[in-house]
Curated annotation (Swiss-Prot):
Belongs to the UPF0173 family. Gene3D superfamilies: Ribonuclease Z/Hydroxyacylglutathione hydrolase-like. One of its GO terms (molecular function) is hydrolase activity. InterPro entries: Metallo-B-lactamas, RibonucZ/Hydroxyglut_hydro, UPF0173, UPF0173_UPF0282_UlaG_hydrolase. It holds the Pfam family Lactamase_B_3. The keyword Hydrolase applies. Keywords: Hydrolase. It comes from the Bacteria. This is UPF0173 metal-dependent hydrolase GK2750.
Amino acid sequence: MKISYHGHSVVRIETNGKTILIDPFITGNTTTDLNAADVKADVILLTHGHGDHVGDTVEIAKRNNALVVATFELATYLSWQGVETFGMNIGGAREFDFGTVKFTQAFHSSGFVTDDKQIIYLGMPTGILFTAEGKTIYHAGDTGLFSDMKLIGERHNIDVAFLPIGDSFTMGPEDAAVAAEWLGAKLVVPIHYNTFPPITQDPERFVSLLPPGVGRALKPGESIEL
């Protein structure tokens, strides 16, 4: 399994002959190494409906005939735009040919702001547990710290956790360090920082808050192998 980070909250997983993208916000992402027009994917997983997470989903999905897996409301909304979707909800798991997806709770919000100043409710925000090849990745999406992260860690043997550290809209570094402890992941990678001024952070400072060898700040385009 190959896992790559592409700035903000964009994660790519290559496993079982498939390419899975999580939260493909590329156009307008000041930290990414990708060009949306060149991105290939078989599956897109979405944590919630904010623009900096849905991003280029529709374009990428249509061009690649990719399946989009998201919460029911968000999946329904995207299906109306001609995208193949599979709707799920928090606590539910589903085994696909590329791996198993389970949605967890997240403490955030989820909605799309239209050009005519309307807000479309798109269901609850989530984190994602993805399991394939005997490895489990937890992408927390956008969230504050919550005590059930302990339960997530107890119920799942997490190999890699992607945790937001930007503050303002999500956990900051200190709370994310507590989350890392509760989750008990073997490796913790910071996400959702330095894309916009309100979420400016030093990822190495976050890494320094964790036990030696647990944290690793990936540069956009950098990969790890499991």
